[in-house]
Amino acid sequence: MRSLLQGHDRQRTAAGTALPPLGGPHPTPTAHQGVATAMRPPGRAAGTGCAMKIVCVGGGPGALYFAIAAKRRDAGHDITVIERDPPGATYGWGVGYGDDLLDHLYRNDPDSAQAVRAASALWQDQEVRRGEQTAYLGRYGYSIARATLLDILTRRATELGVDVQHRRKVDDLAELADADLIVACDGANSRVRQVHGDHFGTRLEAGRNPYIWLGTDKVFSRFTFAFEPTPAGWIWFYAYPSSAEISTCVVECAPETWRGLGLDTLDTADGVRLLEQIFASALDGHALLGQSRGEAARWQHFTEVRNATWCHDNVVLLGDAAHTTHYTLGSGTRLALLDAIELAHSLYTEAELPAALQAYDKRRRAALHPVQAAARTSMAWFEHLDHYLERDLVDFAYAMSVRQGAQAPWHYQLHRATQVPVLRGVRREANRGLRRYLALRRGEMALGTGSVTRRATTTAALAAPAGHQQ
């Protein structure tokens, strides 16, 4: 394994003058972690480290954001991102996130953060539907079309000098023999990881319930859970806006229901038509969309990916190649972006490549342990949904909202109050004030339309403490 001080010791250019620290010392690892400080190689002043030749296999958000974060810290890095699909092609529909991720994005690269926020939809409240009954949860969040996110990050990476290559497939790691570092960002079925499977100690565990990731031309204003009874059992979806025209809609059910409805034998088009009939009320008659990336959506089972270590020699895992979390937690892309920030941080702070990879491995694996545990709990809750669905809907919605752990008694009282329209409006106004405060604190000037104004990246802003964590 190469030292950062050997071989490709390309000195950074004037354009790559070291950034000041992007955050303070690391706290106890959490899933929100992702700050950076200047690299300090032995005998060198802070911020005068060496550049490397880095290749990212896979061109998803994690790979692109790592390239951005690494280039922001050292413009001398020679970074290539290799993606097998053409530009604009992506699976799935939307990506959800919260203010905590925006804090990290603004701290690490305000330019792309502003573009992401401006292109995102805001959803206020969560709506839980069971037949014609409705209950509410007083949470808010943001979502963005995955294709739009990829476009923003690709353009920003290219601006910073990253070589983003599409329509290229890596069949043999020998093609990358001249790379100082190979970052495996090629998803849960990572071929790069499989080459060194014995070293990474990969464990795969499949969930019980089948699910299918669809779109819909109904634009939801709230994050919506819809549960519908059928002769074969309960079936449900999770939906949220992806853009001004489209929402994401993930449908799930027990395997007995899936087979009982014939969804295991119907082709995609017929299966989608059946789901449209089942969810006609919740969809207000709108269509479900079963084509993504030019391919028909298919039913699948979630697979949890865990690895005993995320690095081997000069290969390191990032995002779904390293770990997966159940979609009911909604954290996959967010966690990949935090991995990207942490890896860039470790490369920037450690003098030797082995030490950098070990630091990244230690911190992010520690941060992911509780997240994956919570995701397993969430998955199991939905796999045993029949235990809860006969409850009063308001109590069912509360049980769903606290499925990852007990809450203080007042939390239930707040939930009951949220069912009253006037009090729900008060809570929404309080959330609006919180959003504005957080936006101002991170330098984003929220306007009535939800757009943002540009803020210059100053040394003081980059050195600010870690952002709000939800």
Regions found by a protein language model. Give the residues of each.
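Glycine-rich FAD pyrophosphate-binding loop
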Residues: K71-Y91
